[in-house]
Structure formats: structure tokens, C-alpha cells
Amino acid sequence: MMFERSPDDPLPLVYACSGCSNVAQLANDLALRLDRARLAEMSCIAGVGGDVPLLVRRARSGRPILALDGCPLHCVKGCLARHEVVPTLHLTLSEHGLKKRYGEDCEAQDAERLFVELERLLTPGGKRRCE
């Protein structure tokens, strides 16, 4: 699935898990990279889950949403669901060849592989922007 958008549309929002496992931290790192590359605008899932009015309004704004969860606990998806927000695309990193572990990071090549895939999904026309 790709996000259907033209280059003039507002950036999609990206929400990421930021728990203590390797896949949770990778979700956060990927969201930061997407934000810095101007492929998506990262917003605060803790604020959505904590009922912060400004952040709930942003989540409910109707913009496309990419939800990045590290594992099947689906904390990001659950925080959005509290406010009846369904992400346009929801990815669980542990379903993409990564094993949830504590006390270690994901491999750099796995991070890059997933970033390239997300970049393709978020770029109008599906082409890589960042080399």
C-alpha cells in the first residue's frame, strides 16, 4: 500500500512506539528519519494517549497517518484507537524480519532496509528521494 498524495498535499503524520526494546527504539528512529527527510511529520503518540487536546486534534485532523509499532502489543495503534483514529497504514516491525529483544539495538542494515521501504511508500510516485 502506498499513500496517495500529490507533492502539494500536507505531509502524512507518523506516530512511533518508543518503548525499551530494540524494535520499539527502531520505530522511533525511523519516524525521526522520516520527519527529518520531510517525508512525514512526526507527532507525539504519548500526547495522544495522554489526551493532550492539541495533539488529539492533530491526530483527528484527517491527514494520512503512518503508525509504527515495534511489536504485537500495538501501543501506537491502541493510543490512536482511544480517539477513534484509524491509521492509513499500520506497520509492526517485528513482522518484518526483526525479533524483539531487550538490551541491544537492531542491525543498521535492517534499519536502512525498512527506511527505504517506508520512503518508497511515502514518496509520491513511489521513488526514492534520499540517497
Swiss-Prot record:
Q: Which UniProt keywords apply?
A: Virulence
Without the gene, what phenotype results?
A: Deletion decreases host innate immune response. Diminishes bacterial phagocytosis by host alveolar macrophages.
Q: Name one Pfam family in it.
A: DGC
State the InterPro entries in the record: DGC
What task does this protein carry out? Plays an essential role by modulating the expression of hundreds of genes including quorum sensing system genes and oxidative stress resistance genes under both aerobic and anaerobic conditions.
Instruction: Please give the name of this protein.
Output: Anaerobic and virulence modulator AnvM
Q: Which organism is it from?
A: Pseudomonas aeruginosa (strain ATCC 15692 / DSM 22644 / CIP 104116 / JCM 14847 / LMG 12228 / 1C / PRS 101 / PAO1)
The gene coding this protein: anvM
